[in-house]
Amino acid sequence: MNNITNAQNPFYGQYHTPHETVPFDRIETEHYEPAILEGIRLQNAEIEAIIQNPEKADFTNTIEAFDESGELLDRVVAVFGNMLSAETNDDLQELAQKIMPLLSEHSNNITLNEKLFARVKEVYNQKEALQLTQEQKQLLENAYNSFVRHGANLEGEAREEYRRLTTELSKLTLTFSENNLKETNAYQMLLTKKESLAGLPEIIIEAAAETAKSEGKEGWAFTLHAPSYIPFMTYSDNRDLRQKLYMAYNTKCTHDNEFNNIDIVKKIANTRMKIAQLLGYKDYAEYTLKKRMAENSESVYKLLNQLLEAYAPTAQQEYKEIQELAREEQGDDFVVMPWDWSYYSNKLKDKKFNINEEMLRPYFELEQVKKGVFGLAEKLYGITFRKNTEIPVYHKEVEAFEVFDKDGKFLAVLYTDFHPRPGKRAGAWMTSYKDQWIDKKTGENSRPHVSVVMNFTKPTENKPALLTFNEVETFLHEFGHSLHGMFANSTYRSLSGTNVYWDFVELPSQIMENFAIEKDFLNTFARHYQTGEVLPDELIRRLVDASNFNIAYACLRQISFGLLDMAWYTRNTPFEGDVKAYEQEAWKDAQILPVVQEACMSTQFSHIFAGGYAAGYYSYKWAEVLDADAFSLFKQKGIFNQEVADSFRNNILSKGGTEHPMILYKRFRGQEPSIDALLIRNGIKK
């Protein structure tokens, strides 16, 4: 094993980079394993020191000492995990198959360490007499609960079974993710006839030509990555090709090849159920929701069914309108199928509001949007962004910014990574390389390093990166998460930034999306990339008018994912049936479009099978209720109102997980959230 002083490994010692940012330019794949093993060894030594401490267990020598342990390991794992998502390759994925079980075993060794838990329990049992601050109380509560929820009270055979199941789960979720990425990257629809491109915007045709050319092929290549797939489904006049691409996308990881996830879905659901039952819960949802605002399955189903009842009649009406438009063109027997939905929706939107994504795209050049989004944060919170090319990055497309607070003090490092590439998973996310905390010895507020990662439309030879309106919303969403990370101001790492209840974490991101249709915000940056013309008021008016177009269908789609998630994780017996049939039964009440028997969401539903959203997908809708209610205060007082922005920063963004989210929310809003604000915003309730 490499010694920690080994100068060859950049993870050891100080980085000697601006703000001690990750030295990506010096990190090679072979550096991860020795650094992770060394990190495990060091944390084990730190834990041994806690256990062997001859003094009586107290908050400082046990709870704080435990929270501060594992600094090297956390640093290395943050980089390793982020690279697996944003810049992976075969070597890294092979290493992950070895590393992830090791990390799972190490985690188990900690939470199943009886002597360590005995000390934690000793402090927990005297918590009332300790006169702790709110943050200290929260840290103690979290530490104790974390041990209990990870098997500390299990004995004998049950302990060993817990170890086996959690290690198995870490392998399964990793394989699920890898299969998804590989299957997505493996597919390409190559078109060689120009007439096959009918209806497609020029920018999409150019991008497809460049994709083909980059692989030495003639013609136009369309992929399952969002910037290629979504525009094709929206604009292609060729129904057969839409169906072909739709089927490729919606049957991912169901084929008879090495990327099939059918059995893995069953194994993940069953393994999670067994873990929950081993810990004394009836199912995995009950286990998960104990640490959520929702608290139990009943609350989740209540929300989903409330929304279903409110939105279903409007969604049926939306489908009827689109069906009528399609029949005007195709005849009375025509049935709108899922591969027709985006195409005819776009036509109807154009007809009703005279607006579509391509009309707006020229006004959303990426650099301008970036200025607008950064400028919004400056307007609301007084922070500024300065690009620093001295900060190492992991890919040439990535940029690094220093962020400064309104008093000029350094606040955070923000990385931006905007475009798809083969080593990057689909979707968009915010992540962290370094959490914020306050160093107890020096009193220094150690500032965070966060990153936003997207898969936006790429620039072509002839055009800069021009975003769709949907991509602008996505940027605002992920940037909202990054603000939650950057404004963190907690004493302890584990309570800082986005370390909050899962159904609260989407509030800071979703509230930012509200600005996307605000004229005063759009006017700050939306300029035509060729003429410099400001986005016309008339287009903004149409954009606002169209903002609730098909909103009920979109809501039902999210509800259906929430129902599917809950169906997998409220099971209390192992699942051995047909995954596709189970899926269709689970979400049938929220389906508007005809069922396609071959399609399957579960096999590619990374959120709930490989990400953190198992028994948690409802949290998007939960947070939407919160964000609509919260933004109504901005609307009432003015969208750039300093008082409201300061209150949101001080009561929510900077607080992390230091208090229960409902207490924080009420402190900001002055009341509990009401579903009415969302129904009014969406035009469901007048």
Locate each region found by the language model:
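C-terminal, non-catalytic "cap/extension" segments appended to globular domains
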Residues: 4-31, 38, 219-221, 368, ...
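Short His/Asp/Glu-rich catalytic/ion-coordination signatures at enzyme active sites or charged loops
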Residues: 16-31, 80-99, 122-164, 223-263, ...
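Active-site-proximal, well-structured secondary-structure segments within enzyme catalytic domains
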Residues: 135, 139, 168-171, 178, ...
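Intrinsically disordered or highly flexible coil/loop and linker segments, enriched in small
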Residues: 41, 45, 49-56, 72-89, ...
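Short, hydrophobic/amphipathic alpha-helical patches that form generic packing surfaces
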Residues: 72-82, 141, 145, 247, ...
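Short pre-active-site segment immediately N-terminal to the catalytic Zn-binding motif
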Residues: 457-476
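N-terminal helix-rich structural modules
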Residues: 3-201, 206, 221, 634
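Short, hydrophobic/aliphatic alpha-helical segments
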Residues: 261-273, 449-452, 490, 655-657
